[in-house]
Amino acid sequence: MSAEILNPNLRRVVLASNNAGKLREFSALFAPLGIELVPQSELGVSEAAEPHATFVENALAKARHASRHTGLPALADDSGLCVVALGGAPGVHSARYAQQPGGARSDAANNALLVRELAAAGDRRAWYVALLALVRTENDPCPLIGEGLWHGEIVDAPAGEHGFGYDPHFYLPQQGCTAAQLAPEHKNRISHRAQALAQLLDKLRATGPVDRP
């Protein structure tokens, strides 16, 4: 991948997330492209609402919100875990799966609930979904969308020190380990976010750079 494909106006992009784990992963993925990702919290932008039933709608809402409040191009990710035995849950509610009204979000609580919900399930298949939305302006009529899917299965016992979210319970048969046991640089080559980014950049190459008005 080469930064030569990118419009100079995309050298500094606001990341529409306050999730430290996502910031680490995306910064590592975008650094080789010469793109500086600035978390929206550094620019005084609050988190956008995520009222939609699909990942793509939530990603677009967050990207437009960040661009509106900063005047910068914005990248948003909406991602989550979908479990076959749970009918696709936790899905778009992955980050707040076990959150109580007025309570804080907790990876540990989310994972504990997931394991309980699957206690009697024989089918442990699951997949991570990542939707990336890049808008050059708030009202960009042609946002760039990238989608990535990462298939695995849920295990009861957590393993691994890397990653975040459901990674310690997300087992990858082809790798022989959980996502949390992968070295970060390896995960960043094969994860759902890496796949979504590759697709987004392919679209950017195809459309060419578009100047901000």
Curated annotation (Swiss-Prot):
One of its GO terms (cellular component) is cytosol. Homodimer. This is dITP/XTP pyrophosphatase. Mg(2+) binds at D78. Its cofactor is Mg(2+). Its EC number is 3.6.1.66. Binds 1 Mg(2+) ion per subunit. Belongs to the HAM1 NTPase family. The lineage of its organism: Bacteria, Pseudomonadati, Pseudomonadota, Betaproteobacteria, Burkholderiales. The active site is at D78. SUPFAM superfamilies: ITPase-like (SSF52972). One of its GO terms (biological process) is purine nucleoside triphosphate catabolic process. Pyrophosphatase that catalyzes the hydrolysis of nucleoside triphosphates to their monophosphate derivatives, with a high preference for the non-canonical purine nucleotides XTP (xanthosine triphosphate), dITP (deoxyinosine triphosphate) and ITP. Seems to function as a house-cleaning enzyme that removes non-canonical purine nucleotides from the nucleotide pool, thus preventing their incorporation into DNA/RNA and avoiding chromosomal lesions. CDD domains: HAM1. Substrate binds at S17, N18, N19, A20, G21, K22, S79, F164, G165, Y166, D167, K187, H192, R193. Keywords: Hydrolase, Magnesium, Metal-binding, Nucleotide metabolism, Nucleotide-binding. It catalyses: XTP + H2O = XMP + diphosphate + H(+); dITP + H2O = dIMP + diphosphate + H(+); ITP + H2O = IMP + diphosphate + H(+). The keyword Nucleotide-binding applies. It comes from the Bacteria. PANTHER family: INOSINE TRIPHOSPHATE PYROPHOSPHATASE, INOSINE TRIPHOSPHATE PYROPHOSPHATASE/HAM1 PROTEIN. It is an enzyme of class 3 (hydrolase). Pfam families: Ham1p_like. GO terms for molecular function: dITP diphosphatase activity; ITP diphosphatase activity; metal ion binding; nucleotide binding; ribonucleoside triphosphate phosphatase activity; XTP diphosphatase activity.
